[in-house]
UniProtKB/Swiss-Prot annotation:
Keywords: Cell cycle, Cell division, Cell shape, Cell wall biogenesis/degradation, Cytoplasm, FAD, Flavoprotein, NADP, Oxidoreductase, Peptidoglycan synthesis. PROSITE patterns: FAD_PCMH. Belongs to the MurB family. Cell wall formation. GO terms for molecular function: FAD binding; UDP-N-acetylmuramate dehydrogenase activity. It catalyses: UDP-N-acetyl-alpha-D-muramate + NADP(+) = UDP-N-acetyl-3-O-(1-carboxyvinyl)-alpha-D-glucosamine + NADPH + H(+). One of its GO terms (cellular component) is cytosol. Its EC number is 1.3.1.98. InterPro entries: FAD-bd_PCMH, FAD-bd_PCMH-like_sf, FAD-bd_PCMH_sub1, FAD-bd_PCMH_sub2, MurB, MurB_C, MurB_C_sf, Oxid_FAD_bind_N. The gene is murB. Pathway: Cell wall biogenesis; peptidoglycan biosynthesis. This is UDP-N-acetylenolpyruvoylglucosamine reductase. Its main location: cytoplasm. It is an enzyme of class 1 (oxidoreductase).
Length: 349
């Protein structure tokens, strides 16, 4: 797969502003930063005496991080580019992309190349390298369903390591890289398996409604139709981070057991829920937050978005600590009313 630039000595950027590298727009600073354009550059920094002993943080699009303070260490800006069809067989295409590739642009490229499958994940902010960490998902599809493998550099040793799905240990918005592997690896390339036998994934009512509004029979929808519908839905519901700082969905949709759900539904008959294959029930976190009266409310310059209660926004001048205080207030109220604990999606530093 082509990389954006060859291995070369890495220039260090002292006292580096991270404002442009996090979608909340927080003006945190790194003690030192480095732009990384190849796996070899990640590896070279493992042995570089200039940064020995420093904590390390890999940043892609910065769409899943909340800086509550400056980062007193080395920030590695993943700019590894490249995307290609690496092989195919009778059943599927295998496509690989660099960790620094923009996720949405990569999804659009797969469709332009006639390889559908990722269209439900359109317009999710961030990079290809961040997608496995979070096991991103939307509108009835999780990334893990099309994941084949990834390559990552172990930051402490510079070793290039291959991960299959089992080793990644994917869960709901979760993976090995958010648990035991947190902070240990930089994902430099991801390979996806896109089956040639494609059918539209249109189980979510929002997608079916958007297709109908466009005069498209859901059963005959093409991948591009689904892509366009998802993009339209997300643009209508979610603020553009360039206009209003945010990190997308701030809370995971909680999953509870059937007994707890039955008791909750007895008190809240109109609660929004989604039965899971294992018998548990997923709740809509946005609905819980809205019912607690938080939609559209602000604490200082941090606020809950007026159209989507799952999204916390920076109205201008908010700090990471302000957003975190708002998140804690929301979690407290949801727990008090529903007995359900919300888990935050972004990493707070």
């Amino acid at each position: 797969m082509p990389m954006s630039r060859p291995d070369s000595a890495v220039s260090l950027l002292p006292d580096y502003s991270l404002r442009a590298h996090n979608t909340f727009g927080f003006d945190a600073r790194a003690r030192v930063a480095a732009r990384i354009g190849s796996p070899g550059q990640f590896a070279s920094l493992a042995r570089d005496p200039r940064v020995a002993g420093l904590d390390r943080l890999v940043l892609g699009g910065g769409s899943n991080v909340v800086f509550t303070r400056d980062f007193d260490g080395l920030v590695l800006l993943d700019e590894i580019r490249g995307r290609a069809l690496v092989r195919e067989d009778d059943g599927a295409w295998y496509v690989e992309a660099g960790g620094g590739e923009n996720w949405h642009a990569f999804v659009e490229w797969t469709l332009a190349e006639g390889m559908p499958g990722l269209e439900n994940l359109a317009l999710i902010p961030g990079t290809v390298g961040a997608a496995p960490i979070q096991n991103i998902g939307a509108y009835g599809l999780e990334m893990k369903e099309h994941f084949a493998s990834l390559r990552a550099v172990e930051l402490a040793t510079g070793e290039l390591v291959e991960f299959d799905a089992a080793r990644c240990a994917f869960g709901y918005r979760d993976s090995f890289f958010k648990r035991d592997g947190r902070g240990r690896f930089a994902i430099v390339a991801v390979t996806f398996r896109l089956p040639k036998a494609w059918t539209p994934r249109i189980g979510y009512a929002d997608v079916a409604r958007e297709l109908a509004a466009r005069g498209i029979d859901a059963r005959a929808a093409r991948a591009r139709d689904v892509f366009d519908a998802v993009v339209a839905i997300r643009r209508a519901k979610l603020p553009d981070p360039l206009a209003l700082g945010n990190a997308g969905s701030f809370f995971k949709n909680p999953v509870i057991d059937a007994q707890a759900f039955a008791a909750l539904r007895a008190r809240e008959p109109d609660i929004v829920s989604y039965p899971q294959p294992d018998g548990r029930v997923k709740l809509a976190a946005g609905w819980l937050i809205d019912r607690c009266g938080w939609k559209g409310r602000a604490l200082g310059a941090a606020a809950v978005h007026e159209r989507q209660a799952l999204v916390l926004v920076n109205l201008g001048g908010a700090s990471g600590a302000d957003v975190l205080a708002l998140a804690h207030a929301i979690r407290r109220d949801v727990l008090g009313r529903f007995g359900v604990e919300l888990e935050m999606e972004p990493v707070c530093l």
